[in-house]
UniProtKB/Swiss-Prot annotation:
The keyword Transmembrane helix is annotated on this UniProt entry: yes
The protein's role, per its UniProt record: F(1)F(0) ATP synthase produces ATP from ADP in the presence of a proton or sodium gradient. F-type ATPases consist of two structural domains, F(1) containing the extramembraneous catalytic core and F(0) containing the membrane proton channel, linked together by a central stalk and a peripheral stalk. During catalysis, ATP synthesis in the catalytic domain of F(1) is coupled via a rotary mechanism of the central stalk subunits to proton translocation. Component of the F(0) channel, it forms part of the peripheral stalk, linking F(1) to F(0).
Classification via InterPro entries: ATP_synth_b/b'su_bac/chlpt (IPR002146), ATP_synthase_B_chain (IPR050059)
UniProt subcellular location: Cell membrane
Organism (species): Acholeplasma laidlawii (strain PG-8A)
UniProt GO MF annotations: proton-transporting ATP synthase activity, rotational mechanism; proton-transporting ATPase activity, rotational mechanism
Protein name as annotated: ATP synthase subunit b
Primary location recorded for the protein, binned into one broad class: membrane
Complexes and interactors: F-type ATPases have 2 components, F(1) - the catalytic core - and F(0) - the membrane proton channel. F(1) has five subunits: alpha(3), beta(3), gamma(1), delta(1), epsilon(1). F(0) has three main subunits: a(1), b(2) and c(10-14). The alpha and beta chains form an alternating ring which encloses part of the gamma chain. F(1) is attached to F(0) by a central stalk formed by the gamma and epsilon chains, while a peripheral stalk is formed by the delta and b chains.
Gene Ontology CC annotations of this record: plasma membrane; proton-transporting ATP synthase complex
Cited CDD domains: ATP-synt_Fo_b
Keywords annotated in UniProt: ATP synthesis, Cell membrane, CF(0), Hydrogen ion transport, Ion transport, Membrane, Transmembrane, Transmembrane helix, Transport
TM regions (residue ranges): 24-44
Family: Belongs to the ATPase B chain family.
Length: 175
């Protein structure tokens, strides 16, 4: 407790000593006021001005960053929208090309079938024509053979014994 008593006495004595010399108190007050004015003029205003400029610069940068962020978001949205549109167009183009290719495939197959039918019909007509021609030749040959056989029979060159030989000879000649 002695320590506290000593501290208390020292503070009391210091306060009493301040007020014993008023001229020192006035000089102290004047020096403090001058110090405050000097600090206010030479330090406070420049520091405040610097801090305000720094605050404005930071605010401006934050505003620009927010603006850039909005711009980036807008560009991203536009690109995403454009990507979706292009993707949709590509899908439609693919579907259109696939359907056109399918139609072209069907057309080519149909044309090939029609061409095959036409060629088969042409071959059938050619075969029928050839059959008619060969039939006519065979008829003509039969007529000629029959006429020749009849001539030989009428001229008495053919007998019952050699008729088969004569017919075979004539067939060999005509064919």
């Amino acid at each position: 407790m002695d320590i506290f008593k000593e501290i208390s006495d020292a503070i009391q004595e210091g306060l009493n000593s301040i007020f014993e010399r008023w001229d020192l108190v006035l000089w102290q007050i004047a020096a403090t006021v001058i110090l405050i004015i000097v600090v206010r003029i030479f330090l406070w205003k420049p520091i405040t001005r610097y801090l305000e400029q720094r605050q404005e610069a930071l605010s401006k940068e934050l505003h620009e960053a927010a603006h850039e962020r909005e711009r980036v978001a807008q560009i991203r949205y536009e690109l995403q929208t454009e990507y979706e549109v292009m993707r949709k167009e590509a899908r439609q183009m693919k579907d259109t090309l696939m359907s056109e290719a399918q139609l072209e495939k069907e057309r080519i197959i149909s044309d090939a079938r029609n061409e095959a039918k036409r060629r088969i019909q042409q071959v059938d007509r050619d075969v029928q024509q050839e059959l008619r021609l060969q039939s006519e030749k065979i008829r003509e040959n039969i007529k000629n053979i029959a006429f020749d056989v009849a001539e030989k029979i009428v001229s008495h060159q053919v007998t019952d014994e050699n008729i088969d030989e004569v017919i075979d000879e004539m067939l060999d000649e005509k064919l």
